[in-house]
Every structure is written in C-alpha cells, then in structure tokens.
C-alpha cells in the first residue's frame, strides 16, 4: 500500500498551521462591513479552511478601542462575535482572549472562503493599541478523498 506525503501529514495532524496576524490601530479603526480585514486568504477552488482555534491578544495602548458593536469573524463557517466589553477590545490593559468558535467542533465548511474580521454594523473611532490574532487552522481539500 502506498501513501502520499499530504495524506501522512493529515493523518498525524502535521498539516495544521499556526499563524499570528497583526492588526494595527489604524487598520482596526477603518474596519467596516464593506471593507473587512482579511485574516486568512481564501485557500482556492476545491479547498476549505478548517479553523481550529483563534486566540486574540489585545496589546492595549494608552487609549482603549471603542467599538460600537462586537466585531465579527466571518468566512469558512459561522463564528461568534468578539466581545467589545471592558475585558477585551475596550481595555487599557493587555488582554489574552480565546475566541469561542460557534461552529467548532461541527459546522459546514465553505469552499474557498477567507477568514475576515467585520465591523458588525459598528464603528471604532478611538484606540492606539494593537490586535494580534493567533489562528490555528488546516486547509482541507473538498474532493471525495479530502487529500
């Protein structure tokens, strides 16, 4: 019996990728629903992103962010909003927050969909910190063999 490299990597979860995506205060304050921030690019035709974990680090500045709505993660499946409360985005102290993925561990993965951050019809006008999204994911082929 023979195996290809991608099948072996998948078998032992060696195809899981971890990236850190920084979002500056300037970029975060320009966030709208019509101009989302791309955290992970769409993987291409015949592929889907399987988001396994997202941890948000808010490196707070001297002025807290003030999102008027909870920013949303959107893309490969339906995710939960990121709370804007005093413990996450609107904090003047550093915060490490594990985003609860509403589609995890089950959900329909959408083919060729990017992972984006949207404003959820809100605006952010103040803040001078940084956001860092630590994203753990794998790219899954959507063919019948899934490799």
Question: Predicted segments — roles?
Answer:
Residues 1-147:
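Surface-exposed, low-hydrophobicity beta-strand/loop segments enriched in small/polar/acidic residues
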């Amino acid at each position: 019996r023979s195996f290809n490299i991608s099948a072996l990597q998948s078998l032992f979860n060696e195809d899981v990728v971890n990236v850190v995506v920084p979002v500056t205060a300037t970029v975060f304050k320009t966030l709208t629903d019509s101009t989302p921030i791309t955290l992970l690019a769409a993987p291409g035709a015949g592929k889907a992103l399987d988001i396994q974990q997202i941890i948000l680090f808010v490196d707070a500045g001297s002025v807290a962010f003030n999102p008027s709505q909870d920013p949303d993660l959107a893309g490969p499946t339906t995710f939960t909003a990121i709370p804007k409360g005093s413990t996450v985005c609107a904090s003047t102290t550093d915060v490490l927050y594990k985003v609860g993925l509403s589609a995890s561990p089950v959900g329909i993965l959408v083919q060729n969909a990017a992972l984006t951050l949207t404003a959820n019809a809100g605006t952010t006008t103040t803040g001078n910190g940084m956001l860092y999204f630590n994203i753990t994911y794998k790219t899954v082929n959507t063919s019948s063999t899934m490799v």
